[in-house]
Structures are given as C-alpha cells and as structure tokens.
Amino acid sequence: MGQGKVINQLPPWSVEQLENETPKCPFPKSDDKRVLSGIKVLELCRIIAGPVITRILAEYGADVLKITSPSLSDVPFFQVDGNMGKHAAELDLKTASGRKLFEELLADVDVFVDGYRPGALESLGYGPARLTELAKARGKGIVYIQEDCFGFDGEWAGRPGWQQIADCVSLAHVKHRPS
C-alpha cells in the first residue's frame, strides 16, 4: 500500500496518554489575559508545520523557546514567519554540556514539540519515554507533541521530509478523482 493510502486511513492527529502518575497542575497566574500565558514551550522543529504550531502557541501567550543545532541551522526564509513571538537558542545535544543545559530547560517546560523524523530525538535519548521519566521525577507532567512529515505508519514513516513532498505522496492536493 502506498504512503498516501496509509496516511489517508489515519486521523489527522491522535492523542496518547503516556503516564497518569504526575499530579495535575493549574495554569500559571499572569496579568497577560491570553489563554496560554505562563505556559512554557520548548521547540525542536525546523520547517513549516512544527514552527507554525509553536508560533500559534506563542500568539496565544505561551513563552516559546526554539532550539536549533549548530550543525543544522534554521532555514532563513522560514524564520521571518515561523519564529514570530519566540525566543531562539542554539544547543548541541551531542555534547555533555549541551545535554546538561537541555535537561535543565526540560525541567521547567510544560510543552515539548518534536518536529524531527520519528526516532531522531529518541536516538539522542529524548523520546517520549525519557521525557515521561523526567516529568515523573520533577513531579509535573509534560505535553509531548510529535509532528513529522510522513506519519508514523507506512513505508515512508521514518523518512525526513517537507510538507509539500508529503502532499504529493498522499495526493492531498487532489480534491476529486473521477471513478
């Protein structure tokens, strides 16, 4: 079955509860009246979809920190729109000092957005299972958003890619196909 057929059989998003041991916590108090004011978001995304997700969170008041790699910089063309309302920092997760600082950031965030191909952050030790462990250790849950180009099923599931390529593969641009 082609990747487009696999993707088209799935819902646009899914929600999975990774754990239910950490206590619920109230939204932070703030003078800012936007609904997500006081919510801290850590973004590891590059192109279009992930940065747009976090830009919208920032528009609703969330404090978003975008992390880029020194070996895989942000695409300048997309920075103008995709990074509005965010803070940005460069961090190398392949070094001990980078990992230490990253874990300090993780200790305080409410939302983590992973926009890399499936398994990329997990190979560095920061997949959903590890972040769930960190959340339990700090006594406060975390929302883990995992967004990728081709979905998590099918022959293309592990590939990196851009939305335009996924649209072509899945025929998302076709409104009606004659029978």
What are these regions (language model features)?
Residues 2-179:
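N-terminal helix-loop segment corresponding to the beta1-alpha1 unit
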